[in-house]
Regions:
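C-terminal catalytic core of tyrosine-transesterase DNA break-rejoin enzymes
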Residues: 3, 81, 98-122, 129
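Flexible coil/turn residues that form the inter-helical turn or adjacent wing/linker of helix-turn-helix
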Residues: 4, 68, 90, 108
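Conserved tyrosine-mediated DNA breakage-rejoining catalytic core shared by Y-recombinases
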Residues: 4, 9, 13-50, 125
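ATP/adenylate-binding site constellation spanning eukaryotic-like Ser/Thr protein kinases
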Residues: 16, 41-45, 75, 99, ...
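Catalytic-site neighborhood detector that most strongly recognizes the C-terminal catalytic loop/helix
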Residues: 32, 125-147
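Active-site/catalytic core of tyrosine-dependent DNA strand-transfer enzymes
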Residues: 41-89
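Catalytic tyrosine of NAD(P)H-dependent dehydrogenase/reductases that use a Tyr as the general acid/base
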Residues: 91-95
Length: 149
């Protein structure tokens, strides 16, 4: 979630054929069956290749022990567990990672329209939810750096 910003529903639907290794992209089907292409880093591509080969995956990227597509509650529980192991935040969910993806992109200078496209938002207003963190960051910088703050 953090690396791509995809939704939980999109993650569990990823099939091996959706990954274009040579283009370093992954195709996801978002809300209202809207398809979008997500870029992936070389490190993620290499990791995916190892993961797919190690588990001998054929159809879906994420499966249960029996080889069936994972269900949302299982992914939610795993994400919640691992966030709890590395962080003390109270909100522990796949959406928190998606939110963090968008916030970090914005805070590091990404154009809000590009973030909108990466997240698969139909309207910019949905993406603007993430700008509040940037406003807080600006307030902090202002308070720290301005002599009359």
């Amino acid at each position: 979630f953090y690396v791509t910003g995809i939704r939980l529903s999109e993650l569990i639907d990823i099939q091996i054929i959706d990954i274009e290794f040579y283009k370093k992209t992954i195709k996801v089907l978002g809300k209202r069956n809207k398809e979008r292409i997500i870029p992936l880093s070389e490190v993620i591509i290499k990791t995916l290749k190892i993961f797919i080969n190690e588990y001998k995956l054929k159809d879906f990227l994420f499966t249960d022990i029996k080889g069936n597509k994972v269900y949302p509650k299982l992914v939610y529980r795993v994400v919640k567990k691992y966030i709890g192991m590395i962080s003390s935040i109270n909100k522990r969910s796949p959406h928190v990672l998606r939110h963090t993806f968008a916030t970090h992109m914005l805070n590091n200078g990404a154009d809000i329209n590009a973030i909108k496209d990466l997240l698969g938002h139909a309207n910019l207003s949905a993406t603007q939810v993430y700008t509040h963190n940037t406003v807080e960051k600006l307030k902090s910088i202002y308070k720290q750096a301005h002599p009359r703050a």
